Amino acid sequence: MVKNYINIYNNLVNFTRNKKIFIIFTKEDTFGDRLLILLIHFAFFLKNYKNHEDKKTMQELYDYFFRQLELSIREIGYGDATINKKMKNYINVFHSMLNEIEGWNNLTLVEKSALIKNYLNTNEKVDKLSEYFDNRKSVV
């Protein structure tokens, strides 16, 4: 993995912009929903690449990702106090996701679907989402 983090970030963002994929995830096209989808993709990315890169590189990527996320939130127009509160919440949600996704390969389809459903708060096509992430291991 080359230390060109912008390409990784942009590719992950592009996953959330793909309308066909987005329709699978949720009925609503909101910033919050897209952010959750982005965080899930990033969690899978880190899970899949953590053993292929050194800790320093992975930490740099993590820092870059959340710096870019913060900049995006600022561009929307939120103030400093709101941004700090939102970023703390997003990082906590992300770490919870990352923790649960770590054992993804050992989960049943029902358990995988429950995990996804917990974060996206949807009953729509949850099994398809689990299959989506099973099939995207090498892509994400």
For each feature predicted by the language model, list its residue ranges.
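Surface/interface-facing alpha-helical segments and adjacent flexible terminal/loop regions used
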Residues: 1-140
